[in-house]
Amino acid sequence: MNIILFGPPGAGKGTQAQHIVKNYKYFQISTGDLLRNEIKKKTTLGEDIEKIISKGEFVSDSVVNILLKNAIKNLKFKDKIIFDGYPRNLLQVENLKKNLIEFKQNIGAIIFLNVTSDIIEKRIMGRVTCERCNMTLNKYLNPKEIESHPCGRGFLKKRKDDGSEIAIYRYDTYMEKTKPVLDFYSNGPDFHEIDGSLEIQVIKGKIEQILKV
């Protein structure tokens, strides 16, 4: 089954997605990664995306849908996709539904990691990403993991959109824009809400129970 993994920026979606990928042989589709990859290509579209993200704003639905559809149509992902942080609004819900129907796929679980803004701010301020392996680490939540990172500390970089003010703005914007989506999915039997402030291993255990049902 495919999975939708929800939560505000800094909720730990990436960490949990990595766990599912490693242990359940899933493929993670993160709109953030798709956007950053487009930026790295230095295309005109990538330059426009970079300007928007640096302000803490969200990229348009039409652009996101183009990038996401290109990823979904890869047949090796069929019924093994984690949609990390997507969809964010009702239009994206409809776009996702159309894309899944077109490529004969569906959603089996919707998981929402619910976290407060003060915890989000601390998590985001301590977050770094490895430029070599793309792993996300946090110097506040798990400093030992940074010291022992196999790629070395020299590859750990802070993202441009991880400032304190931008972090809070992104949290508030996310919760405002995503609420209709959460309301839409929360009425279904496949919706699961998890306290995102719990220890990482506890959250992993709760997600594993969902996947085993």
Locate the predicted segments by residue.
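Glycine-rich phosphate-binding loop of ATP-dependent small-molecule kinases
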Residues: M1-V213
